[in-house]
């Protein structure tokens, strides 16, 4: 029986060769064209990890010295910070606004900037490349964004926590890759830079999130800004 099949295939080898070539060509086209489309579609359908549907970003700017209404006496750092917080409170008092939080720096969810670092789990030698986001404590940052709760403290508790220098909050996927657990509370990360070693206690975690809507979730660390640099 197999000999008969082989004879038939051999007798039609030219026709079967074309069929095989067409099959290979279709497979290559499918792999080159369809595979990236499937991957991109899958990545876009992964939840962001925060409530983007109800968020609105308001950009603020400063008057130039030659602009009408410019007040040179209001340019000292203390006044600038006070005015900034007053604007945030002003926005929060609008009808229909549930919460507002200041966003400083160039790296925040779906921003055009990025900030990367390498962290180690204490006692480990394998580095993890991680995105870094700065935030201001006691400004409803985590609950305003609507981040999903992780193990331990809620987003509201993380917003109002009394942070010490070097404290950080991790996404759960960052905690898993560093410590092999989603509950990293009480553990410490290590940052090494030019021979200096910095220990960073983990205060809590939030659910995995997408830094950019086209990306898959990546490890993210949130660093509290205990002072504001107005320079």
Describe every region a protein language model picked out.
Residues 12-41, 50:
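Short, strongly hydrophobic transmembrane alpha-helices
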Residues 3, 18, 51-53, 135:
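Membrane-embedded glycan transfer/ligation machinery
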Residues 96-99, 105-231:
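Mid-to-C-terminal secondary-structure elements
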Residues 27, 78, 128-130:
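Residue-level marker of alpha-helix boundaries and capping positions
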């Amino acid at each position: 029986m197999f000999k008969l099949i082989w004879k038939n295939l051999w007798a039609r080898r030219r026709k079967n060769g074309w069929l095989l070539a067409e099959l290979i060509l279709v497979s290559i086209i499918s792999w080159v064209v369809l595979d990236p489309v499937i991957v991109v579609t899958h990545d876009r359908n992964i939840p962001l990890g925060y409530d983007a549907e109800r968020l609105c970003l308001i950009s603020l700017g400063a008057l130039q010295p030659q602009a009408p209404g410019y007040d040179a006496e209001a340019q000292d750092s203390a006044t600038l910070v006070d005015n900034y917080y007053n604007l945030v409170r002003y926005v929060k008092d609008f009808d229909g606004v549930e919460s507002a939080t200041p966003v400083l720096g160039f790296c925040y969810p779906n921003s055009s900037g990025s900030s990367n670092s390498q962290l180690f789990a204490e006692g480990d030698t394998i580095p993890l490349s991680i995105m870094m986001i700065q935030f201001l404590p006691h400004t409803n940052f985590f609950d305003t964004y609507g981040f999903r709760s992780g193990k331990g403290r809620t987003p509201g508790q993380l917003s109002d926590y009394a942070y010490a220098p070097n404290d950080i909050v991790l996404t759960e996927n960052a905690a898993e890759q560093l410590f092999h657990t989603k509950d990293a509370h009480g553990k410490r990360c290590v940052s090494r830079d030019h021979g200096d070693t910095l220990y960073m206690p983990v205060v809590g975690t939030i659910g995995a999130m997408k830094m950019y809507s086209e990306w898959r979730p990546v490890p993210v660390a949130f660093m509290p800004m205990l002072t504001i640099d107005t320079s």
